[in-house]
Amino acid sequence: MVKTRAILEEYKTYVPGRSKKEIAEEYGVAEESIIKLGSNENPWGPSPKAKQAIIDSIDEINRYPESNHEYIKEQIAKYANVTKDQVIIGGDGADELFEVLAKTVIDEGDEFIVHQPTYTYYEYTFKQSNAKAVYATWNIEENKLDVDSVLNNITDKTKVIFLCTPNNPTGGLIPQEDIVRIIEATDALVVIDEAYWEFSEVNNVNLLKKYNNIFIIRTFSKVMGLAGLRIGYGLSNPDFIEKMSRIKPVFSVTVPSQKAVIATLNDEEFIKESTEKAITEREYLYESVNSIDNIHIYKSKSNYLLMDVRKTGYTAAELTSKLMSRGVIVRDCTSFVGLDEYYIRISVETHPKNEKFIEILKEIVEN
C-alpha cells in the first residue's frame, strides 16, 4: 500500500454544491428544468464580450498562456483602484490563492483564526500545511462577527486571521471599524475575503494604503459570471505579492480565462447590470421567504441568503431532499461548522425561476 501523509487519515473531503447532472440522475428529474440555487453563481451568464473573447482565443490554445499577466494586472488594478504591483492572479477561482497563501506564510505549528460559520475552504487548505485552526464566533442571531472572540484568540502563534465579508453562508457584513480593530491588534496577516463584495457595494481596498498586513481576495466566479473558468485575484502590498508570486503555479490561468477576464473588465455595463439584477432578486427572495410561516430568513448583502427551517418540522437534509426531488437545488449547510442541521442557503436565480422556487417551497412547508 502506498504510504500517504498521516494528516489524511482524519481529513475530510471538501463538500461543494451539487450539479444539475447529479440531481437529474439521482432524482429522475429533467436536467434542463432544474432550478439551481445552491452555488452562488451568476444565473444570467457571462458578458457577451467574454463569450466572444473565448471563441477568438481558440486558435491560441496550442501555446502556453502568458505567465506574468501584466496586462490583466493593469486592468484589475484599474477596477480595484490599486497599482498593478499590488495584484496577484490565480487559477481555480480564488482557491488557488489560499493554497499559495498557506505556502507563503505557514510554518508547522503556526495557528490561524477563522470565524464559524464561514467558507470552509480556508480551514481545508491551511490544515494541509499542518497549521492549527483556532475558532472565533460569528453570532448567528445577529448575523455579525463577534470581534472580541477574534481578538481574544490572538497569540504569538497566530499567523493568519480570516475575515469573510459578506460572510458565506450568512450574508452579513463585517464593518470596517471592526476589521481595523483586528488589523491594529496584530502583526498577523489579515485575509479579507471579498468574493461577493460587488453585491454589498462596499469594500476595504482603502485599508491597503495604511496597513501592510492585509490580503484581500476576490474572484471572477460571482458577479463576473466566469465560475467555469476558475480565476481569481488578490490585493496586498507589493512586497508580499512578490513573495507569493515566487511559489504560485506559473501556468494555472488558461488562455481563454485570461481573454475572458479582460473582456469582462472592459464591459462595465455588464458588471453594473449583473450586480443590480442580483440585488433585486435577492430582495425578492428575502421578502418572499420571509412571508412563509415557520422559516426564518436572514438579511443578506450578497447574492445568497441563509434560511433557518427548524420550525417547519424538517431538518435541512430532509427539506433539501424534498426540494431536489422537485428539481430545485439548494445548499444544505449542515457541513458548515458553527451551524446545526436546520440551515439551508439559497442563491439568486432569474426571476421566473425564483418565483417557481417560492411556489414549490410553499407547497412543501405549508402542506
Swiss-Prot record:
Catalytic reaction equation(s): L-histidinol phosphate + 2-oxoglutarate = 3-(imidazol-4-yl)-2-oxopropyl phosphate + L-glutamate
Entry keyword set: Amino-acid biosynthesis, Aminotransferase, Histidine biosynthesis, Pyridoxal phosphate, Transferase
Positions of post-translational N6-(pyridoxal phosphate)lysine modification: 222
Cofactor: pyridoxal 5'-phosphate
Enzyme Commission code: 2.6.1.9
Gene3D superfamilies attached to this UniProt entry: Aspartate Aminotransferase, domain 1, Type I PLP-dependent aspartate aminotransferase-like (Major domain)
Enzyme class, broadest EC rank: transferase
Stored HAMAP family: HisC_aminotrans_2
Homology family: Belongs to the class-II pyridoxal-phosphate-dependent aminotransferase family. Histidinol-phosphate aminotransferase subfamily.
NCBIfam families xrefs: hisC
Protein name as it appears in the record: Histidinol-phosphate aminotransferase
Gene name for this UniProt entry: hisC
